[in-house]
UniProtKB/Swiss-Prot annotation:
Annotated source species: Marchantia polymorpha (Common liverwort)
Function field: This protein binds specifically to 23S rRNA. The globular domain of the protein is located near the polypeptide exit tunnel on the outside of the subunit, while an extended beta-hairpin is found that lines the wall of the exit tunnel in the center of the 70S ribosome.
Subunit comment: Part of the 50S ribosomal subunit.
Family from the record: Belongs to the universal ribosomal protein uL22 family.
CDD domains: Ribosomal_L22
InterPro entries associated with the record: Ribosomal_uL22 (IPR001063), Ribosomal_uL22_bac/chlpt-type (IPR005727), Ribosomal_uL22_bac/org-type (IPR047867), Ribosomal_uL22_CS (IPR018260), Ribosomal_uL22_sf (IPR036394)
Name of protein: Large ribosomal subunit protein uL22c
UniProt cross-references to PANTHER family, sorted A to Z: CHLOROPLAST 50S RIBOSOMAL PROTEIN L22-RELATED, LARGE RIBOSOMAL SUBUNIT PROTEIN UL22M
GO terms (BP aspect): translation
Compartment annotation: Plastid, Chloroplast
Length: 119
């Protein structure tokens, strides 16, 4: 029995990444719409700290495609990738005379959707 693989979407989600969504979006905009192999090369050589979790998530999505659908990694491209704001870690920095200044440590959620390259 032949299954229709043209409409399958492969997803991977990373939540509560300890980075600002603004800084992660700077990297994500460079790989949106590219093939899996091109995105790997771009992420390998970019000097930003946000590249590492995106690289791990991209390889996880490709492994999902291979394990769940039996698809080759060379036939995949990034159809959707989005970065959403997560929760803030709230901390206080002690200041003079008993005061405390709030510190907000941002997190983000990254979602990658891969699809099969059209022939």
């Amino acid at each position: 029995m032949q299954t229709n693989t043209s409409n399958k979407k492969i997803r991977a989600v990373a939540k509560h990444i300890h980075m600002s969504p603004h800084k992660v979006r700077r990297v994500v905009s460079q790989i949106r719409g590219r093939s899996y192999e091109q995105a790997l090369m771009i992420l390998e050589f970019m000097p930003y700290r946000a590249c590492n979790p995106i690289l791990q998530l991209l390889s996880s999505a490709a492994a999902n495609a291979n394990h769940n659908f039996g698809l080759s990694k060379t036939n995949l491209f990034i159809s959707e990738i989005q970065v959403n704001k997560g929760t803030f870690f709230k901390r206080f920095q002690p200041r003079a005379q008993g005061r405390g200044y709030p510190i907000h440590k941002p997190t983000c959620h990254i979602t990658i959707v891969l699809n099969i390259l059209p022939k």
